[in-house]
Amino acid sequence: MSSLQMSEMSKTYQYRKVMKPMLERKRRARINKCLDELKDLMVATLESEGEHVTRLEKADILELTVTHLQKMKQQRQHKRASGDESLTPAEGFRSGYIHAVNEVSRSLSQLPGMNVSLGTQLMTHLGQRLNQIQPAEKEVLPVTAPLSVHIANRDAYSVPISPISSYAGSPNSNTSSTSHSLLTTIDVTKMEDDSEDEENVWRPW
């Protein structure tokens, strides 16, 4: 091996010997900087959740970060499974409210001898409350669960009662009426009076 080659190898060796510690220090500095930023983020997150952390080691910071990311992943998967990933908190509340109203209507339909007038008043009240939390520019799915009741011990009538029908008297009824087919409230008293008139009609036979 010539002296020139020995000289070049020596220079390369010296360069690596000098640069390797410098690169290592830079790498450690980057790691420490990222860990400090993670620490600040995790401390702020834990404090917002009601936990107070006084001291965190590097391993603790990494463990808390992994746990927090796993928790966020589970929440995202749950939202995706329930179909509410794109809903805002207010939209999620309205969606849950409509679901609850549907359940109320379904439960009322299973009550024997349910008073239609009382059921209509209840569903109208729920519809008015829905109208108060419903923005004018948004639309909601109408609640159209049928309410089956018995009138004067006759056959059961299936009365579709919807809180959307209460929009007719609300300030936003113009926009609601164009986007929804409003269900007319049934005058139960008139139905009962008509049935009684049929029974009381005098017939010569």
Curated annotation (Swiss-Prot):
Residues 93-126 form the Orange domain. It is found in: Nucleus. GO terms for molecular function: cis-regulatory region sequence-specific DNA binding; DNA-binding transcription factor activity; DNA-binding transcription factor binding; protein dimerization activity; RNA polymerase II cis-regulatory region sequence-specific DNA binding; sequence-specific DNA binding; sequence-specific double-stranded DNA binding. GO terms for biological process: cell differentiation; negative regulation of transcription by RNA polymerase II; nervous system development; neuronal stem cell population maintenance; Notch signaling pathway; positive regulation of neuroblast proliferation; regulation of neuroblast proliferation; regulation of neurogenesis. Gene3D superfamilies: 6.10.250.980, Helix-loop-helix DNA-binding domain. Has a particular type of basic domain (presence of a helix-interrupting proline) that binds to the N-box (CACNAG), rather than the canonical E-box (CANNTG). The C-terminal WRPW motif is a transcriptional repression domain necessary for the interaction with Groucho, a transcriptional corepressor recruited to specific target DNA by Hairy-related proteins. This is Enhancer of split mgamma protein. It comes from Drosophila melanogaster (Fruit fly).
